[in-house]
From Swiss-Prot:
Coiled coil start-end: none
UniProt-listed Gene3D superfamilies: Winged helix-like DNA-binding domain superfamily/Winged helix DNA-binding domain (1.10.10.10)
Family in the record: Belongs to the DEPDC7 family.
CDD domains assigned to the protein according to its UniProt record, in alphabetical order: DEP_DEPDC4, RhoGAP_BRCC3-like
UniProt name for this protein: DEP domain-containing protein 7
Taxonomy, superkingdom: Eukaryota
Gene: depdc7
Length: 520
């Protein structure tokens, strides 16, 4: 007669009821331990990050993703599925989660740091658009392993994945959550529903991005924002298999080989921008490359002038359809509100289509390198930062209704924060999560979403704001009348007299001791 162990082996019950594959729960689904499930779902979500060929530090790297985008994906997953209830999750703690995943070999950094003549891989995960990572490939089947000696769960790739994960040598997963000051929610409340269609998720992201923008920026009209639809880039990128068939492919390859031969990140970033230039400009650059003996200034100026010429003659990357948003961000900067301005800029860039975001990211990275005062001097009489601003302002934002001062302020602000402007704000993650959960649960998705267009204030604060705003606008009107050179002296005196009769206190406050000389 067969023993119980033999029957279990014949029915493969060990695999079915292992810690990685627990017996069915009350709802009939197979669920692993809660911590193991959370880690597995995080790793599975991370595989949705955009992976493609990228160029960095003078080399091309295949199948890479950006550190900041990995944080965005994990952040969105944690907030959307509410593993920790309604607890607010700072971005810095999501970075620590990514650090733990890198420590246990889910992915690895591909950018190396040179120390004392030796290359050494970075050990600290960087939430940056300049840091590249790659999943570790292995054909081994992976599951959630449990260290029986201390009960620690190890995050591993799902069995259908081809990524390998080594045992976690840091504290257990439960300890990691405690160290992050995050309390896991009731497992019965964890969102295990199927994913929504990508179209629905995309519409929610755009809707909530606009909603958050309206909370940060005062807009006179909403039509342009509410009717906004991403526009395809003017110069579409050519597929790699089609690019091989064009006569200009060789010129682009020559430029890439030329930049590879130069130990200069400046040149590498410039050549990356050439991918978005038309063929005839790339051909001109390729066939006018200087000789090897030529000084750096000659070919760097050639690249800088070519890229600048292209972007001076095309529409800005921050499209004029969102002009009111750009004006609002500039007003925030004028008033010294840098944090809201940065978040509004991040939201504005989130509305761009993916090709435009990638083009802007490359251009901004090149601008930041070229603006560095320690880099090659672009102009003899002007520092690099001002030269870059003057050359590429039209490429970033250009509208005749936005004053030059505010335009320059906005461009320099984006340039100074080029490492942060492509990150997704945590507030947007929370808003998108709440909306998606409401849709999945079948409840009203627009209920309890916070104010969008106004905020309730008490009567005293309202009256004070009304008086201050009225006084400010009256002073602005008085200044316009007094400094308007197109008005004749007689007409100006008449208008000032009318203003004095209607608002004598504001008139006296503005002119002070000069009242008699101005009014008479």
């Amino acid at each position: 007669m067969a023993t119980v162990r033999e029957k279990a082996v014949s029915l493969n019950l060990c695999a079915t009821y292992s810690p990685a594959q627990r017996p069915p729960g009350p709802n009939g689904s197979h669920r692993p331990f809660r911590a193991t499930y959370i880690w597995s779902s995080i790793i599975q979500a991370l595989t949705q990050v955009e992976v493609k060929k990228r160029r960095h530090h003078l080399k091309y790297h295949h199948d890479c993703f950006i550190g900041s985008e990995a944080v965005d994906v994990v952040f969105a997953h944690l907030v959307q599925h509410k593993y920790f209830g309604d607890t607010e999750i700072p971005r810095s703690k999501v970075v620590r989660v990514c650090q733990a995943l890198m420590d246990c070999k889910v992915f690895e950094p591909i950018v190396t740091a040179c120390m004392f003549g030796r290359e050494k891989k970075r050990t600290v995960f960087e939430d940056s658009s300049c840091s590249l990572y790659r999943f570790i490939n292995n054909s081994s089947h992976l599951g959630a392993q449990v260290e029986k000696s201390n009960g620690r769960c190890t995050p591993q790739r799902p069995k259908h994945s081809s990524f390998q994960s080594a045992p976690l040598k840091s504290p257990s997963l439960e300890d990691l959550w405690d160290n992050l000051s995050l309390t896991a929610a009731d497992p019965t409340h964890i969102n295990l529903t199927a994913n929504l269609p990508p179209k629905v998720v995309g519409e929610v992201w755009q809707e909530q991005t606009i909603r958050r923008l309206l909370q940060l920026v005062d807009l006179p009209l909403l039509d342009s924002l509410l009717e906004y639809t991403p526009v395809a880039p003017r110069i579409p990128q050519v597929k790699e298999e089609e690019l091989n068939l064009t006569s200009n492919y060789l010129d682009r390859e020559i430029l890439k080989a030329f930049s590879d031969a130069q130990a200069d990140e400046w040149v590498s970033a410039a050549v990356d921008c050439l991918d978005f230039l038309p063929d005839h400009m790339v051909v001109d650059v390729s066939r006018n490359l200087p000789e090897q003996q030529a000084p750096d200034s000659k070919w760097k100026l050639l690249l800088f002038d070519t890229i600048g010429k292209h972007y001076q003659n095309r529409s800005p990357l921050l499209r004029n359809q969102l002009f009111d948003i750009h004006t609002g961000i500039a007003e925030l900067l004028v008033n010294g509100k840098n944090e809201p301005a940065l978040e509004a800029t991040q939201l504005c860039l989130k509305l761009l289509d993916s090709p435009s975001r990638e083009e802007f990211r490359r251009l901004l990275y090149f601008m930041a390198l070229a603006a560095d005062p320690s880099e090659f001097r672009l102009h003899e009489e002007t520092d690099n930062r001002m030269t870059v601003k003057r050359m590429f302002s039209r490429a970033v934002v250009c509208n005749k209704n936005l004053s030059k001062g505010k335009c320059d302020l906005l461009v320099l602000f984006i340039l100074d924060h080029h490492k942060d402007v492509f990150k997704i704000p945590g507030s947007l993650h929370k808003m998108v999560s709440d909306k998606l959960v409401a849709i999945q649960q079948g409840s009203d998705p627009d209920r309890d979403t916070g104010y969008t267009f106004c905020q309730r204030v008490d009567k005293r604060e309202f009256d004070s704001a009304t008086q201050n705003n009225t006084r400010t606008e009256l002073c602005a009107l008085l200044k316009t009348i007094y400094e308007n050179t197109s008005l004749s002296p007689k007409e100006k005196k008449r208008l000032l007299g009318q203003f004095y009769k209607s608002h004598p206190e504001t008139f006296i406050q503005y002119f002070g001791d000069r009242v008699s000389s101005v009014y008479t």
